[in-house]
Amino acid sequence: MAHPVQLGLQDATSPVMEELITFHDYALMTISLISFLVLYALFSTLTTKLTNTNITDAQEMETTWTILPAVILILIALPSLRILYLTDEINNPSFTIKSIGHQWYWTYEYTDYGGLIFNSYMLPPLFLNPGDLRLLEVDNRVVLPIEAPVRMMITSQDVLHSWTIPTLGLKTDAVPGRLNQTTFTATRPGVYYGQCSEICGANHSFMPIVAELIPLKIFEMGPVFTL
């Protein structure tokens, strides 16, 4: 989960998030190197006399600064496309859970367990216990298994929402009249937090998402809910 004054990304809890963090570091390193070279060239131009205003043609240089950026963009695009494919790939999920966005709460439906449905509202500050997180705790957590592919089917009953849990690398829009889906495989148990990531009205900031990830063997005994 996130920490105060945190500058980096949250720790990964799924293979896709691990890929995203690796790609982020790779792209950031590439961009930093390019920025350093450009700033160095500008600084050298301003502080030295290594310039020639009489040059009217430099085809080799123009060819180089056309091809080189194209190669760099391709090297960045290829791993990006690979991750994009991984995020959309859905193969034989073990469990399916439906999430419905409302103004301003979430409804969860366990389709594999007799259509069990419950709502998840943010806990107001008056009901928080010591150690709870303000604006992030809910009355009913969505309980999910680890080490098993889970498919989330996401839609909305009113306006646009977005179901997001950063540590799992999940962000899927909830669109009225449309059923979007995403999949993930969590790698470790814990309680992980997210929020609606699409501006959806006056109380947009007050519809958090809390996922409690438990071992698969415990989940298969019957989902454990904090109802």
Swiss-Prot record:
Q: Name one GO biological process term.
A: ATP synthesis coupled electron transport
Arranged from A to Z, the UniProt key words for this protein are: Copper, Electron transport, Magnesium, Membrane, Metal-binding, Mitochondrion, Mitochondrion inner membrane, Respiratory chain, Translocase, Transmembrane, Transmembrane helix, Transport
Cofactor dependence = Cu cation
One Pfam family per UniProt:
COX2
Which ranges does the record mark as transmembrane? Answer: 15-45, 60-87
Its EC number(s)? 7.1.1.9
Q: How is the cofactor bound?
A: Binds a dinuclear copper A center per subunit.
For the Mitochondrial matrix compartment, the record's topological domain ranges are: 46-59
Q: What is its main location?
A: mitochondrion
An example Gene Ontology CC term for this record: mitochondrial inner membrane
User: Which GO molecular function entries does the Swiss-Prot or TrEMBL record give?
Assistant: copper ion binding; cytochrome-c oxidase activity
User: What compartments host this protein?
Assistant: Mitochondrion inner membrane
Could you say which residues bind Cu cation A1 here?
Answer: H161, C196, C200, M207
Q: Does the keyword Acetylation apply?
A: no
The reaction(s) catalysed by this protein are: 4 Fe(II)-[cytochrome c] + O2 + 8 H(+)(in) = 4 Fe(III)-[cytochrome c] + 2 H2O + 4 H(+)(out)
Name the source's superkingdom.
Answer: Eukaryota
At which positions is Cu cation A2 bound?
C196, E198, C200, H204
Q: What ranges does the Mitochondrial intermembrane topological domain annotation cover?
A: 1-14, 88-227
Membrane topology, from the record: Multi-pass membrane protein
Give the enzyme's main class according to its UniProt record, as a single word.
Answer: translocase
Cite the record's note on assembly.
Component of the cytochrome c oxidase (complex IV, CIV), a multisubunit enzyme composed of 14 subunits. The complex is composed of a catalytic core of 3 subunits MT-CO1, MT-CO2 and MT-CO3, encoded in the mitochondrial DNA, and 11 supernumerary subunits COX4I, COX5A, COX5B, COX6A, COX6B, COX6C, COX7A, COX7B, COX7C, COX8 and NDUFA4, which are encoded in the nuclear genome.
Protein family membership: Belongs to the cytochrome c oxidase subunit 2 family.
State the protein's name: Cytochrome c oxidase subunit 2
Gene name linked to the record: MT-CO2
